Amino acid sequence: QQRALFRLVLHNREHLMAQMPMRICHPPMDIDEWQNKTGSDPKNWPWSYHNGGHWPSLLWFFGASILLHEKRYPKADVLLMGQMRALIEECYWSQLNQLPRQKWAEYFDGPTGTWVGQQSRTYQTWTIVGFLLMHHLLRAEPDDVLMLDLEEEF
């Protein structure tokens, strides 16, 4: 199941990662569905906030799942896992280059996550911590991902 999810993300990479990884839901609700379900909440218009916005703090969850899968199953689908590793590296560098300049914004709007969210708060703890966790797991202590293994017996 996990590898099927990884393949799905790769297949939809352009939409889910785009310029600011990672989109919170895909596809976003269209105008009619948005009006009916949210009462035309301006924060949740299509491609924004919880309706297709990009939330950088989500990347560490996804990255950790890839790294943990590599630890658990080092010989499983090596080609796929190589592609997934390359994807999280690319996303990491994207965030490293953008987030400090964009004041660690909470979320990003638009089909590609190009714009800082219309009501986004800056210097968000979860944005900063999410990036630092991804950095820690990729660069500092990769084995620390094992702390997140819920199937491991202690």
Regions found by a protein language model. Give the residues of each.
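A short, highly charged, low-complexity intrinsically disordered segment
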Residues: 144-154
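CBM-like carbohydrate-recognition segments
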Residues: 97-144
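Active-site core of glycosidic bond-cleaving carbohydrate-active enzymes
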Residues: 1-98, 137-140, 152-153
